[in-house]
């Protein structure tokens, strides 16, 4: 029975880690042991950041909608309540995009929300 060696797998594994560590500062980009730790930490941070980004995008959409709606004399919460009562099912991403790119259509949505609230008084 022939003796199995791990050199091929080991080379591939080291190359993969060092490729992921390309651009890291100092020893972390060239030394396998340091690169392994740095890559592990970087991947963990990116995993968390992908989840955090979802919340920050939602906060951004809400800020944009709030800014657009306040110019029409409504608060964000009253506007969203009006949409719910009017049966308009648009998510915050679409509403935010509409407020920026198509103010005319967004104005129609605001008017529908005000009508559902009954007059639109703040």
Swiss-Prot record:
- Pfam families associated with the record: Ribosomal_L20 (PF00453)
List UniProt keywords, sorted A-Z. Ribonucleoprotein, Ribosomal protein, RNA-binding, rRNA-binding
Molecular function as annotated in GO: rRNA binding; structural constituent of ribosome
Keyword match Cell membrane: no
Q: Does the keyword Lipoprotein apply?
A: no
Which CDD domains would you find in this protein's record?
Answer: Ribosomal_L20
Task: Name a single GO cellular component.
Answer: ribonucleoprotein complex
Domain of life the protein comes from: Bacteria
What Gene Ontology terms for biological process does this UniProt record contain?
A: ribosomal large subunit assembly; translation
Q: Which Gene3D superfamilies match?
A: 6.10.160.10, Ribosomal protein L20
Q: Which PANTHER family match?
A: 39S RIBOSOMAL PROTEIN L20
Question: What is the recorded function of this protein according to its Swiss-Prot or TrEMBL entry?
Answer: Binds directly to 23S ribosomal RNA and is necessary for the in vitro assembly process of the 50S ribosomal subunit. It is not involved in the protein synthesizing functions of that subunit.
The family assignment reads: Belongs to the bacterial ribosomal protein bL20 family.
Protein name stated in the entry: Large ribosomal subunit protein bL20
Q: Tell me what organism the protein belongs to.
A: Treponema pallidum (strain Nichols)
């Amino acid at each position: 029975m022939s003796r199995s060696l791990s050199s091929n797998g080991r080379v591939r594994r080291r190359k993969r880690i060092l490729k992921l560590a390309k651009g890291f500062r100092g020893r972390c980009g060239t030394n396998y042991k340091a690169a392994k730790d740095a890559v592990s930490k970087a991947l963990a941070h990116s995993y968390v950041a992908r989840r955090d980004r979802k919340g920050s995008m939602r906060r951004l959409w809400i800020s944009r909608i709030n800014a657009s709606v306040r110019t029409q004399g409504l608060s964000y919460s009253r506007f969203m309540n009006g949409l719910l009562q009017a049966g308009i099912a648009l998510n915050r991403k679409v509403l935010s995009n509409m407020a920026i790119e198509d103010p005319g259509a967004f104005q129609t949505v605001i008017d529908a929300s005000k009508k559902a609230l009954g007059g639109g008084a703040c």
